[in-house]
UniProtKB/Swiss-Prot annotation:
GO molecular function, one term: fatty acyl-[ACP] hydrolase activity
Compartment(s) of residence: Plastid, Chloroplast
CDD domains in UniProt: 4HBT (cd00586)
Source organism (scientific name): Coriandrum sativum (Coriander)
One GO term describing the cellular component: chloroplast
Keyword Repeat set for record: no
Main location: plastid
Name used for this protein in its record: Oleoyl-acyl carrier protein thioesterase, chloroplastic
SUPFAM superfamilies with a match to the protein in the record: Thioesterase/thiol ester dehydrase-isomerase
Pfam family, one: Acyl-ACP_TE
Keywords: Chloroplast, Fatty acid biosynthesis, Fatty acid metabolism, Hydrolase, Lipid biosynthesis, Lipid metabolism, Plastid, Transit peptide
Source organism phylogeny: Eukaryota, Viridiplantae, Streptophyta, Embryophyta, Tracheophyta
Record: active site: 262, 264, 299
Catalysed conversion reaction: (9Z)-octadecenoyl-[ACP] + H2O = (9Z)-octadecenoate + holo-[ACP] + H(+)
Record carries keyword Lipid metabolism: yes
Length: 369
């Protein structure tokens, strides 16, 4: 037993100048500043083995972080989706003491990133695979669709399940089911499409087979959709809003807090900009039920943004009502004439370049509120 280690090690001499070491339990993570000096007479191969073991220990320590131990989430039994529970905090609710749509969108983003970490991806926070990091590739949002059937209130606990799967040859998709953890009621669903961008050139890039092979092993083998209904709202094309818009909010600037780790404006910030041009009287009488956003252009930190909104003329007044709880259930429709629908358009101020187009649907607030 060497006096410099807290646990015993075994040495087996292969030749006069070759030594092999096997650890019985764990080499102490303490490293003496005079480590090399104390072992000047030991074969360099031993030092190499010890350094490699130290490196493996540090990697193991990082992979089993304190955050992962305390996080209320884990992979499902089949390993093909991820569930996590969240408590709605006081700073995440609005005037009605219910979570805002931005809060919901942030939780969706958080659980997606945690899912990637749980399968060994996203060591840099970008939900990227090893090949993507090697080639400086990142995922960016192309489309987001969120439906909220009941907003969770302050101190409620929600459980969000998420999974990803391939979406053609140019992207991937991620879906979510949001439940009230206390009742197991589905209170929201969401789906999104992501495309690959080169972080250096900021140009979109086709998803290679190498990248696809890395993440498909963690995806459902058969398509699983959070919106399995035929002709559901997530599939609806968003018409372009034509000028002049009935409502507008001009001169919006990205804040420093709006920038994410990819050095561009976080996709949740666009939701806030879209809602800036909603008439105030609508906010008093209605609450957001559905939002769909198509991301057309990357917004830079020094861009100035105009938010435009006009009512959507649409003969379809049906609203989806959830019956099941697993994301595969059928949906029923019921006529409703108190809902409001709007088209949205975000552009670079002064240039007219399209950043984002969107569609929202609003339901009448409950009388209880």
């Amino acid at each position: 037993v060497y006096p410099h280690f807290k646990t015993p090690i075994q040495c087996r001499f292969l030749t006069s100048d070759s030594i092999s070491i096997r650890r019985r339990t764990a080499v102490s993570r303490w490293r003496s500043p005079t480590f090399s000096a104390n072992y000047n007479g030991v074969n360099a191969q031993v030092l190499g083995v010890l350094k490699q073991e130290q490196k493996e220990i540090e990697e193991e320590k990082r992979s089993s972080s304190l955050a992962e131990k305390l996080r209320l989430g884990s992979l499902t039994e089949d390993g093909l989706s991820y569930k996590e529970k969240f408590i709605v905090r006081c700073y995440e609710v609005g005037i009605n003491k219910t979570a805002t749509v931005e809060t919901i969108a942030n939780l969706l983003q958080e659980v997606g990133g945690n899912h990637a970490q749980s399968v060994g991806f996203s060591t840099d926070g970008f939900a990227t695979t090893p090949t993507m990091r090697k080639l400086h590739l990142i995922w960016v949002t192309a489309r987001m669709h969120i439906e909220i059937y009941r907003y969770p209130a302050w101190s409620d606990v929600v459980e969000i399940e998420t999974w990803c799967q391939s979406e053609g040859r140019i992207g991937t998709r991620r879906d979510w089911i949001i439940k009230d953890f206390a009742t197991d009621e589905v209170i929201g669903r969401a789906t999104s499409k992501w495309v690959m961008m080169n972080q250096d050139t900021r140009r979109l890039q086709k998803v290679s087979d190498d990248v696809r092979d890395e993440y498909l092993v963690f995806c459902p083998k058969t398509p699983r959709l959070s919106f399995p209904e035929e002709n559901n709202k997530s599939l609806k094309k968003i018409s372009k809003l034509e000028d002049p818009a009935q409502h507008s909010r001009l001169g919006l600037s990205p804040r420093r807090a709006d920038l994410d780790m990819n050095q561009h404006v976080n996709n949740v910030a666009y939701i806030g900009w879209v809602l800036e041009s909603i008439p105030k009287e609508v906010l008093y009488t209605h609450e957001l039920e559905t939002i769909t956003l198509d991301y057309r252009r990357e917004c830079q930190h020094d861009d100035v943004v105009d938010s435009l909104t006009s009512p959507e003329v649409d003969e379809d007044t049906a609203v989806t009502k959830i019956i099941g709880t697993n994301g595969h259930a059928a949906a029923a429709t019921e006529a409703r004439d108190d809902s409001l629908k709007f088209l949205h358009f975000l552009r670079v101020s002064g240039q007219g370049l399209e950043i984002n187009r969107g569609r929202t649907e609003w339901r009448k607030k409950s009388e209880k509120r």
